[in-house]
């Protein structure tokens, strides 16, 4: 299983710290950077020396929006999986995120296990697009 490099975009320090800890403990992930607003996230992602396999982004940020981060991330020269993790994962918001290039959308309140499974499948070489079936 390959270790994935992840970039986290989350404005809440407590949620960000807990998410980093959970991802690094439960999935083959090393978090290589984080941002709390759109400008910082887009800036980090646009620097050629900063490469990651996975971007996990919240919709509502300290300033700007996760939607702007998604738009910018789809233009990266290196293919990167884009995941939205939000408390506002309504059907309409999920559709909007997928239209903007997100590979998956997870609800913070009840889909953390699904996010961990997604990350494990990615690290194991899966494409993990669309809905996932449980591992037998």
Summary of predicted features, one role per range:
Residues 68, 89-106, 110:
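Alpha4 helix (beta4-alpha4-beta5 surface) of REC/receiver domains from two-component response regulators
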Residues 67-78:
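Short amphipathic alpha-helix used as the core "switch/output" element in two-component signaling
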Residues 34-54:
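Acidic, metal-coordinating helix/loop segments flanking the phosphotransfer/catalytic sites
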Residues 10:
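Conserved acidic carboxylate
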């Amino acid at each position: 299983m390959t270790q994935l490099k992840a970039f986290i975009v989350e404005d809440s320090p407590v949620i960000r710290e807990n998410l980093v800890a959970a991802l690094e403990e439960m999935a083959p992930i090393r978090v290589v950077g984080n941002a709390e607003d759109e400008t910082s996230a887009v800036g980090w992602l646009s620097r050629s020396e900063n490469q990651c396999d996975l971007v996990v982004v919240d919709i509502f940020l300290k300033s700007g929006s996760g939607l702007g981060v998604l738009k910018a991330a789809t233009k990266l020269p290196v293919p990167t999986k884009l995941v939205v993790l939000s408390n506002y994962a309504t059907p309409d918001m999920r559709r909007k995120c997928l239209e903007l290039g997100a590979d998956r959308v997870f609800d913070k309140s009840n889909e953390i296990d699904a996010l961990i499974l997604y990350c494990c499948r990615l690290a194991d070489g899966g494409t993990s697009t669309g809905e996932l079936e449980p591992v037998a």
